[in-house]
Amino acid sequence: MTKISKKTVLVGLSGGIDSATAAKLLKQVGFNVVGVHLRLWHKKPSVLKEREDLVKGVAQKIQIPLIIYNAQKEFKKYVIDYFLKELKNGRTPNPCIDCNYFIKFKILSQLASKLKADYIATGHYARIKKIKKNNKVIYELLKGKDKNKDQSYFLWRLNQNILKKTIFPLGEFKKEEVKKMADFWQIKITKSIKESQNLCFTNDLEKFILKNFKTHKGAIIDLTKNKKVGEHLGIYFYTIGQRKNIRVPYKEPYYVVKKDKKTNQLFIAPASKKEFFQSNEIELERINFVSHKPKLPLKCEVKIRYRSQFIKAILFQKYKKYHLKILKPVSFVTPGQSAVFYQKEKLIGGGVIK
């Protein structure tokens, strides 16, 4: 990174190596760095205190001031309440998408405006490219250089107002390089914060569901026979593509392919009958285009889950609604999850699967 004149940047600090290294990098190139830790939610207040103590230690090591912002109210509204609402409607939400947009980036942006800071930054593995098009400055969101760690998928809701004042210091680096930098600067996290694909606000989803919903057992229907073959534990416990806890008397693997909240029925099909769980068209809602609305139809590559492979598709509009035509049928398209579309390195936008 190039040396710059003194400008202030607010850096989101989680207590992990990535955000700590991002903050140190920015300080090294001449920014006036202020750390911001967002207090979210955990059922054990002691866990929150442990994390805050960890972040304080990181800020002290890097020698930067630290702001601790209580974001519990916003987190409950935009993440937990939305998650519960989607579950209640029979969908499988990805709360990390809304957490990034409504909590991390919106709150950091609001604090930056209030404190008259020039930029905000996080430890995400993603990149931003500033271009000029038709005499207009546009900020494009790109994949991180480390393809295994790329986190652009989670950022599809970001807009130009946020991107124009955002810096991703780690976007050009691989995880191994970040670890080496942290070692060189002796940034040590005394208590490891695990990188996890699980929900940050609960480590036991079943208990969380039982606490928030009345669950009822119901029929499991085999779609190939159109008859009841078992009983499920409660429809909220299952998601499309799930194999676990399907209690049926078959040796062949069976998967959840559909849920009917009204009848409390779970529909399954065997792995050998792909016609029951494959799709070649996806309808989207809550669409966002990061830079600008592209000319449609648009050839693109799509991810329908964070760790899924890219699939070739065409984005188009039908009756004013956005659809993805999948060129090769894809399995277990899950309502509530995010479909994010790219052209090469550039993230064009995303939407929620209807």
Where does each model-flagged region fall?
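ATP-dependent adenylation/nucleotidyltransferase module used to activate substrates
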Residues: 1-156, 176-177, 183, 256
